[in-house]
Amino acid sequence: MPLKHYLLLLVGCQAWALGLAYYGCPSECTCSRASQVECTGARIVAMPTPLPWNAMSLQVVNTHITELPENLFLNISALIALKMEKNELSTIMPGAFRNLGSLRYLSLANNKLRMLPIRVFQDVNNLESLLLSNNQLVQIQPAQFSQFSNLRELQLHGNNLESIPEEAFDHLVGLTKLNLGRNSFTHLSPRLFQHLGNLQVLRLHENRLSDIPMGTFDALGNLQELALQENQIGTLSPGLFHNNRNLQRLYLSNNHISQLPPGIFMQLPQLNKLTLFGNSLRELSPGVFGPMPNLRELWLYNNHITSLADNTFSHLNQLQVLILSHNQLTYISPGAFNGLTNLRELSLHTNALQDLDSNVFRSLANLQNISLQSNRLRQLPGSIFANVNGLTTIQLQNNNLENLPLGIFDHLVNLCELRLYDNPWRCDSDILPLHNWLLLNRARLGTDTLPVCSSPANVRGQSLVIININFPGPSVQGPETPEVPSYPDTPSYPDTTSVSSTTEITSAVDDYTDLTTIEATDDRNTWGMTEAQSGLAIAAIVIGIIALACSLAACICCCCCKKRSQAVLMQMKAPNEC
């Protein structure tokens, strides 16, 4: 073979080897044509090599890598995103990220990092997102993030940080999202956030904060979300949020707040969600929640509130969800809900209410769902739902109700779900109107549990819906008459027991004739019935068909309303708190 052929073969082999070095994919990884490399698996204990020189995205997940040595990524300078999560990583050497000047996204979350070298990020000045969450970090150096003028997102939640130097964020002027939740902070410096004028999301949840100094959030004029839930905050300074006029979501739940200072929420015109559940609030002063014209959700459950005064929520005319369950409410003033003209859902369950004023819900013209279960309600005014024509769900189970007023639900044409079980219903003559209404509207009771009679003793435990309620009329002595088949009373909402009994007795006496006369005239139809009996049978059949049609219509209404209700609730209800 000529010498030039040997030379060509040698050059070709070298080029092939060089191509592998630049374009090859490590056996432990998968590489796509879109310059994406993914390396996963417990068998990986060191960074796989060689990595393709044109890689733009590298993911190293669920490996046993413990260390990133110096100059590890020198040959992949085009890298834009590096994700190293859920590894055993505990050490990063200075210079590990050298030559990654194009990197925009770096995630080191869910590792075992305890300390970070002071200049570990000096070669990635163009980072926009840095995720260090769910490690074991105990300290942040004052100049740790000093070179990140382009950083937009910093995630430090889920570490063991007890404090942060007050100058740690001074150079992060472009930061829009900062998560410091689930650490062990006990205090914050008033100047910690003073250079973060572009910050939109600040999360400090699940720490040990007991007090927040006045002025801590004054520089955060663009803040939209502030998460302070699950701390140990006992008091709030009156002007704590006065400079946060763009705030939309404020989470204060599960703290130790016992009172709300007057004017605490006065300067929050954009707020649409406020959570205060799981605190120690005992009273709500009228006007404390206003004006907040954009507030849609107010969560106040699991407090110690005992009463609601007139106009407590009068400045919240766009409120759609009000949750007051699991308190100690014994009294609600008739004007407590004034101004809540757009309220859709009202939760008052698990309180100590015994009575409600007939006008208490009169201003809630758009209410759709109301939960009153697990109180001590003994009775309800007949007009309590008079102005709430759009109700689709009413929960009254687990109270002390023995009866309900005539016609209390008649105008609620959209009612789909009514819960009445676990009440001590008294099934005497007074219950017949409710019994008849339930017969015609059984589909609205659902299929889980039906209301059951508690008294008298002879009907205890029987369903209020299907029980056969018979009340004897006055006895009339007369000659023995032929036995006439009995038919169920016609289900009708008005109580007509006395009328029907008298009519039946009078008819039986007036129409009495000798049996021989009946047999002689043979005035019976094909089924062996008299004309009167045939009329009763036909009437019973017609009424049965009408009742079946009403039940079917109620079922269709219920299905349609449930879909509408779920759609509304899906639009109102927000994700879980961060």
UniProtKB/Swiss-Prot annotation:
<feature type="transmembrane region" description="Helical">
    <location>
        <begin position="536"/>
        <end position="556"/>
    </location>
</feature>
<feature type="domain" description="LRRCT">
    <location>
        <begin position="423"/>
        <end position="473"/>
    </location>
</feature>
<keyword id="KW-0812">Transmembrane</keyword>
<feature type="repeat" description="LRR 10">
    <location>
        <begin position="270"/>
        <end position="291"/>
    </location>
</feature>
<dbReference type="GO" id="GO:0005886">
    <property type="term" value="C:plasma membrane"/>
</dbReference>
<feature type="repeat" description="LRR 8">
    <location>
        <begin position="222"/>
        <end position="243"/>
    </location>
</feature>
<feature type="repeat" description="LRR 12">
    <location>
        <begin position="318"/>
        <end position="339"/>
    </location>
</feature>
<feature type="repeat" description="LRR 4">
    <location>
        <begin position="126"/>
        <end position="147"/>
    </location>
</feature>
<dbReference type="Pfam" id="PF00560">
    <property type="entry name" value="LRR_1"/>
</dbReference>
<keyword id="KW-0732">Signal</keyword>
<dbReference type="Pfam" id="PF13855">
    <property type="entry name" value="LRR_8"/>
</dbReference>
<keyword id="KW-1003">Cell membrane</keyword>
<feature type="signal peptide">
    <location>
        <begin position="1"/>
        <end position="21"/>
    </location>
</feature>
<dbReference type="GO" id="GO:0046597">
    <property type="term" value="P:host-mediated suppression of symbiont invasion"/>
</dbReference>
<dbReference type="GO" id="GO:0030335">
    <property type="term" value="P:positive regulation of cell migration"/>
</dbReference>
<feature type="region of interest" description="Disordered">
    <location>
        <begin position="476"/>
        <end position="500"/>
    </location>
</feature>
<keyword id="KW-0677">Repeat</keyword>
<feature type="repeat" description="LRR 9">
    <location>
        <begin position="246"/>
        <end position="267"/>
    </location>
</feature>
<feature type="glycosylation site" description="N-linked (GlcNAc...) asparagine">
    <location>
        <position position="369"/>
    </location>
</feature>
<protein>
    <recommendedName>
        <fullName>Leucine-rich repeat-containing protein 15</fullName>
    </recommendedName>
</protein>
<feature type="repeat" description="LRR 3">
    <location>
        <begin position="102"/>
        <end position="123"/>
    </location>
</feature>
<feature type="repeat" description="LRR 5">
    <location>
        <begin position="150"/>
        <end position="171"/>
    </location>
</feature>
<keyword id="KW-0325">Glycoprotein</keyword>
<dbReference type="Pfam" id="PF12799">
    <property type="entry name" value="LRR_4"/>
</dbReference>
<feature type="repeat" description="LRR 1">
    <location>
        <begin position="54"/>
        <end position="75"/>
    </location>
</feature>
<keyword id="KW-1133">Transmembrane helix</keyword>
<dbReference type="GO" id="GO:0005518">
    <property type="term" value="F:collagen binding"/>
</dbReference>
<dbReference type="GO" id="GO:1903077">
    <property type="term" value="P:negative regulation of protein localization to plasma membrane"/>
</dbReference>
<feature type="repeat" description="LRR 11">
    <location>
        <begin position="294"/>
        <end position="315"/>
    </location>
</feature>
<feature type="repeat" description="LRR 2">
    <location>
        <begin position="78"/>
        <end position="99"/>
    </location>
</feature>
<dbReference type="GO" id="GO:0043236">
    <property type="term" value="F:laminin binding"/>
</dbReference>
<feature type="repeat" description="LRR 14">
    <location>
        <begin position="366"/>
        <end position="387"/>
    </location>
</feature>
<feature type="glycosylation site" description="N-linked (GlcNAc...) asparagine">
    <location>
        <position position="75"/>
    </location>
</feature>
<keyword id="KW-0433">Leucine-rich repeat</keyword>
<dbReference type="InterPro" id="IPR003591">
    <property type="entry name" value="Leu-rich_rpt_typical-subtyp"/>
</dbReference>
<feature type="domain" description="LRRNT">
    <location>
        <begin position="22"/>
        <end position="53"/>
    </location>
</feature>
<dbReference type="GO" id="GO:0001968">
    <property type="term" value="F:fibronectin binding"/>
</dbReference>
<keyword id="KW-0472">Membrane</keyword>
<dbReference type="InterPro" id="IPR001611">
    <property type="entry name" value="Leu-rich_rpt"/>
</dbReference>
<dbReference type="GO" id="GO:0016324">
    <property type="term" value="C:apical plasma membrane"/>
</dbReference>
<dbReference type="InterPro" id="IPR000483">
    <property type="entry name" value="Cys-rich_flank_reg_C"/>
</dbReference>
<dbReference type="GO" id="GO:0046813">
    <property type="term" value="P:receptor-mediated virion attachment to host cell"/>
</dbReference>
